[in-house]
Amino acid sequence: MVRFFGLNKKKNEEKENTDLPADNEQNAAETSSSNVSGNEERIDPNSHDANPENANNDDASTTFGSSIQSSSIFSRGRMTYGTGASSSMATSEMRSHSSGHSGSKNSKNLQGFKDVGKPLRAVSFLNPVKEEESQDTQNTLDVSSSTSSTLATSGNARENSFTSRRSITLEYIHKSLSELEENLVDIMDDIHQDVISISKAVIEAIEYFKEFLPTTRDRIPYRISLEKSSSLRKINKIVLHFLDNLLVSDAFSNSRSILLRRFYFFLKKLNLITDDDLISESGVLPCLSVFCIGSHCNLPSMDKLGMILDELTKMDSSIISDQEGAFIAPILRGITPKSSILTIMFGLPNLQHEHYEMIKVLYSLFPDVHMYCVKDYIKKAASAVGSIPSHTAATIDTIAPTKFQFSPPYAVSENPLELPISMSLSTETSAKITGTLGGYLFPQTGSDKKFSQFASCSFAITCAHVVLSEKQDYPNVMVPSNVLQTSYKKVLTKESDRYPDGSVEKTAFLEEVQRIDQNLNWQKSNKFGQVVWGERAIVDHRLSDFAIIKVNSSFKCQNTLGNGLKSFPDPTLRFQNLHVKRKIFKMKPGMKVFKIGASTGYTSGELNSTKLVYWADGKLQSSEFVVASPTPLFASAGDSGAWILTKLEDRLGLGLVGMLHSYDGEQRQFGLFTPIGDILERLHAVTKIQWDIDPQLDG
């Protein structure tokens, strides 16, 4: 067995039939020809040792003969000379054969010793050099023929390695996975019982991965699935437990990297990581990521996990207490989606050692479900502005532009009376809180005269925590955000003070400040709208957090992203694909969605099949959520109210899935949203009017 710093388990020596390094294909192929036994012989019946007569003495003759002519750093010349006692495995007949051919005194003196150390040498086990000891001149003449023999042997070894890989059976692979699982389970039991240190345990785990299918360096000719292999799921769980829970300290960073890299090659060998995956082989270490539980996920325990979380949300909040924002997120975790397993992520704003101890207690709850805890929490996606957000867009032309073009850190419209969706928004008097204009809703009053006054009205929608105020019942709203414009103005004014009076730079900054002032004054004279209703409450264990804003009749309201928003990574978001044309009531797990927030702009993700459970406002709540993909960012402060959208498959245009209200504040990879169906249902219950994303047709 290949040893890592000389540490390994004794029981591994008893279980393994071969002692092969997994990182060297040629050595593995050469060693397998002389040392294979048990299962490996059954896998490769066409091995070069098929001749019984030759096979009987192959081991001994190879070891014996290889010491006679080989390259050595201890000999005076390029070739070494036989000792007559090549190995303790040599038979008495072979030793007498050696004595008959050797005329040196040293050979006779060393014949009686069985454990004489041998010099380092490069040998071929498939075609051993026969023992021929003669004068130095004869050895010199034999160098050419010996080299040719070694080259031919290397080619045969490589060919036999490919033959052995082709002959590996699926039964043998599953047996090897089962053995690896047993070894790793034993290690984990020893860790939890404090029998072995984590440092030694991870070294042994790495060694076990090295010895998995040692004769196969590349991919196996089969495809192993996590759904059908319980051993593979358990192996994944143990490795993730190492990486996420046991090796989180900086002291284990090197061990963590080695184990992760070894695990990567293990998955690649099983075809769970393909060349099409985003993991490069340029020396950059792979990393663990989170993925959504999609509609194609058929892993065992998924239904049971969903039932547990559903029951948890029904519990009485009065008997539960936790840190504000703490959450439980059911997800997939691994290197790639195809190689990931079911995972329960515990997010806690104040992570302590006792939480890791809790994970150890829960470790055996599910045999193939990974659990880990991170410093993270759920928070509202409104922004309490302390600095300017990084998202930039084109400038608004309310006055003549300056010769120096500035790009404010918020989206603006080419026409101030035609405001597209997803722009920044705040109340007129707000000094800190800012969010995103989700879109527009239109009441469907029909022929009911009681609601005829609302028939031609347009209403904007955003999160209630963005615009509701205790100081004012029906505040006026500004788009773009008054908070962002005021903050941007302060930054420019402060920067202008660094330049001398009359300089070109200071003049440019002051002109931009003047332009912002004029735009703010225009917005106050041409009010966008006023909040008429909103609520932030728990209804049926679900958060209802939205408000509707009656828009001034001088504004033209359309559910479109607008042509002024140009920073889209998706090139297909053009023309008809800029317009929201349908409501999506039936959400498919794994559906690809995106949002355009006032803070982070365009980000994409996938819908998770199971809801996230979190503790907020003294109550246990649940919510649908999006897992960021392919980048690990989905939402941040200032994105509250942004619509969750998807591209329609059967026609051009966008579908409305829901509205963002929260995100995980530390890692920002989850976006919590309210489905559009729930929003419209709640609005109908409150107003007694049907609502839609399209204006009511006359007649």
From Swiss-Prot:
InterPro entries, sorted: Peptidase_S1_PA, Peptidase_S64_Ssy5
Family the UniProt entry places it in: Belongs to the peptidase S64 family.
Serine protease: region residues: 459-699
Highest taxon of source: Eukaryota
Stretches with biased composition (Basic and acidic residues): 39-51
Start-end of Low complexity biased regions: 52-78, 97-109, 144-154
Active site (record annotation): 465 (charge relay system), 545 (charge relay system), 640 (charge relay system)
A GO CC term attached to the entry: plasma membrane
Membrane topology of this protein: Peripheral membrane protein
PTM notes: The propeptide is autoproteolytically cleaved from the catalytic domain but remains associated, forming an inactive protease complex. This processing occurs even in the absence of signaling.
Entry protein name: SPS-sensor serine protease component SSY5
Region span, Disordered: 1-113, 129-158
Bias kind Polar residues: ranges: 24-38, 83-93
Record keyword Lipid metabolism present: no
Triggers of expression: Down-regulated after extracellular amino-acid addition.
Keywords: Cell membrane, Membrane, Zymogen
UniProt key word Membrane: yes
Subunit details: Component of the plasma membrane SPS (SSY1-PTR3-SSY5) amino acid sensor complex.
Short name of any one Pfam family annotated for the protein: Peptidase_S64
Subcellular location as annotated: Cell membrane
